[in-house]
Amino acid sequence: MPLTGKQRRQLRALGHHLEPVVIVGQSGVTEGVVAAVEQALHDHELIKVKIHEGPEDRHEAAEKLSQGTPAELVQLLGRTALLFKKRAEDSEFDKL
């Protein structure tokens, strides 16, 4: 289910103080990066991903990450993407 504008705004505010937990390197979005993002989303629900120079531009890399994982792209600001996937149970974001 897509996020509403209000939900995106709340997630952006919560994600402001987060540090990137996954870094996309020179190889771009690979299977290993997608697996790392999925694991981080399982652990944290809301994550930042740092996108360095690579074969794709930052918009393409962020889209690949959101399509390759069950995550929603909340924001792309510069080279940092904010991704969100709500857990089915035990979610910290039940009030969204």
Residue ranges and their predicted role:
Residues 1-96:
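Positively charged, polar, low-complexity stretches
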